[in-house]
Amino acid sequence: SHRLPRGEVAAILEILKPALVVGGEPDWNAPKSVPQNFVPEGVSDEPLDRPVARYWKAMTSGGSTGRPKIILDHLPAVTDTAVAAPLNMQPGVKLLNPGPLYHNAPFIVSHYALFAGGSVTGMAKFDAEEALRLIDAHRLEWVNFVPTMMHRIWSLPEEVRNRYDVSSLKTVFHMAAPMPAWLKEKWI
């Protein structure tokens, strides 16, 4: 996250020793970095080699010590797009990602959508009415909420909720916390 304190970023970079950092501050101690707003001078049409990273993701966790920890997914960086099928994520899906990509679920579902040839509409910060507006404006089909987000949307005045057409949604997925039965019933 761009909001991490510099000390935490330094600790994460020290633990991971990344080959490349995309974005970030110019003074970060990274062997190679691509600065924000980078535009290459030229792009080749030549096919690229297909290197596979050793790990497909490395998520951070504060843990109980106060020092950042890295949770490595030891699977290789290849994805079978068929894994998205049980999530009802069809090829070409239009997904709303209301959560930060440094959390596991938003990271995974956004990647599955992109790997399936879909598009991702992200939110810089969750806002209940803005989520409804984006679903309406972009005819989004799939979203992963946490119960708190669903509660905030349901807590909007009925006239605000009804202002937006969300009939394009095919899947509303939730995880990360228990869902109160009454809230799930309202959403169904």
Residue ranges of predicted features:
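Conserved AMP-binding
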Residues: 1, 99-103
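Structural core segment of the AMP-binding/adenylate-forming
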Residues: 1-51
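Short beta->alpha linker loops
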Residues: 3-4, 24-26, 53, 126-127, ...
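Short glycine-/acidic-enriched loop or helix-start segments at secondary-structure transitions
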Residues: 9, 27-33, 70, 106-108, ...
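Conserved structural elements of the adenylate-forming
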Residues: 52, 56-57, 69-91, 151-155
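Conserved helicase ATPase motor motifs in RecA-like P-loop NTPase domains
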Residues: 58-65, 178
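Conserved AMP-binding/adenylation subdomain of ANL enzymes
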Residues: 80-94, 102-142, 156
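Conserved adenylate-forming
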Residues: 115-116, 124-188
